[in-house]
Amino acid sequence: VVLFMKGTKMMPQCGFSSRVAGVLNYMGVEFADVNVLADAEIRQGIKDFSDWPTIPQLYVKGEFVGGCDIITEMTLSGELDALFEAKGVTYDKDAAEKIREANAS
């Protein structure tokens, strides 16, 4: 699991990157972070590679999953859990449920 983001998982530099890193951290997912602010070539290259114009970008087992809005929707719908299970990614199911419960109202 790799998150191309602005900043790092310990110090995100934008709200969208912070939200996705926060979800992954809360769910106990081990992930690598790539700070696109550190290298303009990586920042543009990942946008070209995915044909997606914005950062952050989440990849699971080499597959582009989406940006902040998509990851938020997938978390709330349970699709992210299903993807992690299908790809053999370890995560905390109880934490995922707590996120959904907190956003159910």
PLM regions: where:
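Short amphipathic alpha-helices and their capping/turn residues within compact interaction modules
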Residues: 1, 25, 29, 51, ...
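Local sequence-structure signature of Cys/Sec-based thiol-disulfide redox active-site neighborhoods
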Residues: 1-30
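Structural micro-motif
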Residues: 1-2, 50-61, 66-69
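Eukaryotic short linear interaction motifs
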Residues: 10-13, 42-43, 73, 92
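Alpha-helical interaction elements in eukaryotic regulators
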Residues: 16, 38, 42, 51, ...
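Thiol-based oxidoreductase modules, predominantly thioredoxin-like and allied folds used
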Residues: 25-45, 49, 53
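Non-catalytic, surface beta->alpha helical segment in thiol-disulfide oxidoreductase systems
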Residues: 60-95
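Mature, matrix/stroma-exposed regions of nuclear-encoded mitochondrial and chloroplast proteins
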Residues: 91-105
